[in-house]
Amino acid sequence: MIVDAAPSLGGQAVGSIIGTIIGLYTHGPQPYQITHGIADELIADLTQEGSLSRRVSMTGTITFQYDEVRLARWIERKVEEAGIRALVGAVLTGVGFDGRRVRHLELATRFGSARVEARSYVDASGDATLCYQAGLEVREPDAPVYGSLNFIIEGYDTDAVKDLVIKEVHDRLAERGSQYGLVRHDGFLMHFPGKTVMLANVTHFETPLDPAAGAQMVFEGRRQADNIIRFLRAEFPRIFANAKVRTYGNPGLRQTRWIVGARQLTLDQIRSGERPADAAARCAWWVELHNAKELVHWERFEPDHVYYIPLSCMVPREADNIVAAGRCVDADVSALSAIRVMGPCMAMGAAAAHALDLAAGGSVHEIDMTALQNRLTDNLDRRS
């Protein structure tokens, strides 16, 4: 079963319009794919229907821009085809936990309460919600890590946009952005080839774990999106004179709260690229820390540099039947900023499912790592 607090499936990839799939390939003159499985199916299916655009980036890697509406339907179809029951619009209100095991979940929906019992659980909430509600130890950043509200632009000149130079936009944001109520000086504006829409990721705001602040994140993100449109119309009228927002995404959260695992992945470990004995996923994305309003902090690695996520940073040290996947695994702030992107999240999801399957009714801390890595060989060793 999959449980989602949103009224539909897709997480931030759909609801927050992340808009790009990154982290599937290495960086370098000949980048190669390091995460496979469901990623291969997604690329093949969405490419065939024209909903995915392959991009060779200026940083020497391969990323994909996707149509979020078509991705949402693809996810729904895949869930149905796999026979997975989905419970949407379900907010976690309580966790039955004893003897180092989650026994059941208590959920609230607009149609009434629900209770879910399972042998094992994956915390893919992004905010370590399952572990937090179970009373397990969690971590939070010492300083803000900024989120973004992505949005889709339409009405711009699709011929003139070919002349858009993003560095000129960045320079103008640094010079005049404050006059339009803007705080961020970088980000991207990405026209979808063959379509009449553009993805915008150029906002920054704080994302506190405060229930009363949720609406303010939406308001502030949309206010910045509106101000970006004003800025583009005034500063780049040849392209954006008639531009407008077509769709606002939900606030995109990056690093808010994460588990305390059996071990913590560190920046030094991803710099070294040393493969741990319990490697469960392979990564190559650079450090991308949104710790300042104005600019993202990047730390770039050498071409073809890869590093690994150990299973021990995905398993809460106080629980036997939970594996975390995604941006709530245990890593220091810098390391987490590198592994939280979509490619590694897919790899962690696969590792979590296989680890819990091997654990059966026992402890995920005690599984046969050779058996797990044999199942995950495409994501750990394949070079293609």
Residues of each region from the PLM?
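Conserved beta-strand positions in the Rossmann-like core of class I SAM-dependent methyltransferases
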Residues: M1
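Conserved N-terminal/central alpha/beta ligand/cofactor-binding core
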Residues: D4-G94
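Short beta-strand element of the conserved SAM-dependent methyltransferase core
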Residues: V95, L107, F151-G155
